[in-house]
Each structure stands twice: as C-alpha cells, then as structure tokens.
Amino acid sequence: MIWGLLFLLFLAVIFIGLNAFYKQTDYFKWQHLELESYKQGVPEQLDCGGFGSTYALYAFQAMPQYHSNNRFFNFSLNAESIEQDYLLFNKYKSHFNKGAFVLFTLAPCVCYYTYEESPQYNSYFLLSHKELPNFKLSRFIRFKFPLLYDFKQIFRSLKFLLNGQKQELSLDALFPQSVSEEVAKMNMKGMAEGWMHLFRLPNLREKNQDELNERVLKENADYLKSMIDDCIQHEMIPVIVITPLAKELTNYFGKAFLDNGMYKLIQDAVGTHQVRLLDYLYDADFQDNRSLFADGGFRLNVAGSSLLCKKIMKELLEN
C-alpha cells in the first residue's frame, strides 16, 4: 500500500515537473507571446497605457520609445474583449499617474465581442479567481496543467526545440514584414468572413439586426463608460483610439454598419464627457500602404506602429 502511494507521489512530482518544463519552452511561450511583458511586471507611475485587442497589441509596439523609464505599458492582448479591458483596467488603474493618458483602442467588430468568446487562458493567468467572472476550477486546472489534457504537447515542444532555431520572442517575428497584394486580399477576405460568421452577420455594410449583438453592444458601451468615468474620477485622461486599417479590409465596411455599431458604442460610452477621439480608421497614410501591415491590412508591423505612435503622441502633446 505505502509503496503504491509513494509510486503515485513520484508520478505526480514527475508530471508537475514536466508541466513546469513545458511552460518554459519557446513552443509554449510563442502561443502566449503577449503575456511576456506582463511576466516582467507592470510598472508603476505610468504616464500612458493602451488597452485593446489584437490590433492594439501590434499598433503600440513602438510606443515605449516615446516614454522613458517604463512609463508606458501595453495592456492589449490577442482577441481581447472590452470586458477583459475593463477587468484589467480595474486591476492596474492604480499604476497610472494623475494626468496619465489611458488609450482605449477600438476596431469595428470588437463592439460585438464578449468575454466568453475570448481566449480564457490570458484572463486566468493575469487575474485572481475573485477577479474573474464565472470562475471555473476545471478550467483553472486545465490552464495550470496543460499536459493533463494533451500530453502530446510535450513532444511537440521537444520537436520545436530540436528543429527550430533560437529566435527572439517578438510580435513582429510572427509575421513577414509585409505581404503581396494577392495575399493581403486573401487575408482580409478571411478576416471579414470570420467576423461575419462569429457575429452572425450577413455582411459588414448594413446595420446589425441581431438581437444578441445589440445586447452585447450595450454591455460593452457600459464597460467603456465605466472605465471613462473612472479615469475622470481619478484625474487620468481617457482617449479613444481607432487604429488604421488598409483598404483591403475597410472596403468591406459600410457607413450604416459602423455608425450603428462602433460609433454608437463610443457615443453611448462617452455621454456628456469631453473625451478625445483619435480616429485613424481611414487614415490616408495607411489606406493604400499595405507595407505598413504584417498581414496586409489589420496588424501593423513595426514601421506601421512607429508611424501611428508618432501621430498619436503628436495629437496628445499638442492638444
């Protein structure tokens, strides 16, 4: 009996050790690359910070060069919902100085996106169980011990280690510097069709008619409003930023869809407050220049990020 228990204990120790090893491999880190900055710690006394989804994660790559001594932090995550923005903002708002710029970054379809649809790993990694909506112990265990549900990952990580060359963990390394016109059109067509499928939309030109989308739109407006109110209460400066997209993607959008979706969300969230809106959606410098995008029209590369951040800081500091 005691030998059996000791053997089980030995297996448990081996399994925990393998999980710890796996989570330190580049194979695992590449899957959760946006968390690397969080692992280094969120600085105190921030003068500026950005919240948003994938588009913001890439858009703000160059922003630290405008803020010395770690005074900027990009809180954005891949496929992040506005509710996740809200949860992270509440956790880290004490890290901002008075007078700091808090950039809430939006794109046309994020207004219909919910927390439950977003990847849960990031939330479980960054937030405590008390801070998480609908915390589930089974989900926590799955994220804590990924090999428990897919042990083959340890072999994939070893294959990645043996076959791949050591590469610096960076967002820009995930994509080429730019893509051809043909690839850009294909990528953006896939993105537009993916949004239509995810949000049950016949197209991205007409006003949304889906009742669930309308409910989510109102909820997300409430989350954004709460963050704006909190900023003003704590003497921080909320700024809404709409990141640029190339024409390969904006050609899918119609005025009715945007006015009754993203822009309605902004209007409802801002209310009577005077909140600056920096709208680069159709910015001419980006519309016809897919070379500024890593995927042809959605994710900015380093050059695109540098240009956008320069524009943003010019607006913030001159007005």
Set out the residue ranges of the language-model regions.
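Active-site segments of SGNH/GDSL-like serine hydrolases
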Residues: 228-255
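Alpha-helical transmembrane signal-anchor/signal-peptide segments
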Residues: 21-41
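Hydrophobic membrane-insertion alpha-helices, especially the h-region
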Residues: 2-21
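Substrate-gating cap/lid alpha-helix
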Residues: 247-280
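Membrane-embedded segments
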Residues: 55-142
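Histidine-centered active-site loop/cap adjacent to the catalytic His
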Residues: 293-319
